[in-house]
């Protein structure tokens, strides 16, 4: 490392202070504490932003466990907060599992559109998961949250989430090119069902609206002023390898990433007084922390402790979230 380079602040203070951010993704390998970190970040953002939404896109839906509160597919206020909301979606469920609020309308047209749309998108490989993200994004954008934090599934799912606007743009483009063929068929279909008042262009208009929103989201995802990604890892080989792969893929996708959280670290006061396993783990972690420092010298690297108790419940998360803002100092650490 070059000695005269000033190291970047080892916290997420830079993200919390960046008022322009609209979308923050938190991801990494399974089991590294992504949910605790994303929930803690959302709590800190709620102190300085008007309204914050945290969305879980992991089918395991750990944010319900983290906040000790059941969340659904509709944004729900988190207990103990006035401006923090949470929701959980399953991207594998497809459009049929989304709540009816996503397909509002005064007549049967939109309900027909939902079914027809599901059938049509099933014919396009990879677009079903992307379209469920798209419908959620449409809902979220309409609610005008100041910032949205995504608690993502393990890496493979995360990369698909990041790429979904491009997948949807491509898929909807194909559908819209077919709309002249689809509209007459839809007209015949709804007439057979006795719904003569339904406008055959309803589906086409819905697709047009969706494409417009997704194009906008795609532009925002590629704008570092509006979107960034926080990688969470632990100081072990496989986690570090996965983090490097994730950083490279994000860079390839044009997504900003300049924050890494290293979680579950041992902060030993005196390795001689520690058990042999703790001392051994400490040495392993030190080795990988050195590698992280070399690999990511132009990143904000935040180090979080391994705690004796799990972080669960709003007050516990609120307390733990302070570690994102200033470097963790173990209790009883001797003054230098």
From Swiss-Prot:
It comes from the Eukaryota. One of its GO terms (biological process) is tail-anchored membrane protein insertion into ER membrane. The keyword Transferase does not apply. Its EC number is 3.6.-.-. ATPase required for the post-translational delivery of tail-anchored (TA) proteins to the endoplasmic reticulum. Recognizes and selectively binds the transmembrane domain of TA proteins in the cytosol. This complex then targets to the endoplasmic reticulum by membrane-bound receptors, where the tail-anchored protein is released for insertion. This process is regulated by ATP binding and hydrolysis. ATP binding drives the homodimer towards the closed dimer state, facilitating recognition of newly synthesized TA membrane proteins. ATP hydrolysis is required for insertion. It comes from Drosophila erecta (Fruit fly). Pfam families: ArsA_ATPase. PANTHER family: ARSENICAL PUMP-DRIVING ATPASE ARSENITE-TRANSLOCATING ATPASE, ATPASE GET3. One of its GO terms (molecular function) is ATP hydrolysis activity. NCBIfam families: GET3_arsA_TRC40. This is ATPase ASNA1 homolog. Homodimer. Keywords: ATP-binding, Cytoplasm, Endoplasmic reticulum, Hydrolase, Metal-binding, Nucleotide-binding, Transport, Zinc. ATP binds at residues 29-36, 236, 263.
């Amino acid at each position: 490392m070059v000695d005269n380079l000033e190291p970047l602040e080892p916290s997420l203070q830079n993200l919390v202070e960046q008022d322009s951010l609209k979308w923050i993704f938190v991801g990494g390998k399974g089991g590294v504490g992504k949910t605790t970190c994303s929930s803690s970040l959302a709590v800190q953002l709620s102190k300085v932003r008007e309204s914050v939404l945290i969305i879980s896109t992991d089918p395991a839906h750990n944010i319900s466990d983290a906040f000790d509160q059941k969340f659904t597919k509709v944004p729900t206020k988190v207990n103990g907060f006035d401006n923090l909301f949470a929701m959980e979606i399953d991207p594998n469920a497809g459009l049929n599992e989304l709540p009816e609020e996503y397909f509002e309308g005064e007549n049967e047209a939109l309900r027909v559109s939902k079914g027809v749309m599901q059938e049509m998108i099933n014919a396009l490989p990879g677009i079903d998961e992307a379209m469920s993200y798209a419908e959620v994004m449409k809902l979220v954008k309409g609610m005008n949250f100041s910032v949205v934090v995504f608690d993502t599934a393990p890496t493979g799912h995360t990369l698909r989430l990041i790429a979904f606007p491009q997948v949807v743009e491509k898929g909807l483009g194909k559908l819209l090119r077919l709309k002249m063929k689809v509209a007459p068929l839809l007209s015949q279909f709804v007439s057979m069902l006795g719904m003569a008042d339904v406008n055959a262009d309803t589906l086409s208009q819905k697709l047009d609206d969706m494409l417009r929103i997704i194009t906008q989201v795609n532009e925002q995802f590629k704008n570092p002023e509006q979107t960034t990604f926080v990688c969470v890892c632990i100081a072990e080989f496989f986690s570090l390898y996965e983090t490097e792969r994730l950083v490279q893929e994000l860079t390839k996708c044009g997504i900003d990433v300049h924050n890494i959280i290293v979680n579950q670290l041992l902060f030993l006061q005196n390795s001689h007084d520690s058990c042999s396993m703790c001392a051994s783990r400490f040495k392993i972690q030190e080795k990988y922390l050195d590698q992280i420092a070399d690999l990511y010298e132009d990143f904000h690297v935040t180090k979080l402790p391994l705690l004796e108790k799990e972080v669960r419940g709003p007050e516990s998360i609120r307390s733990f979230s302070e570690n994102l803002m200033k470097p963790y100092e173990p209790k009883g650490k001797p003054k230098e």
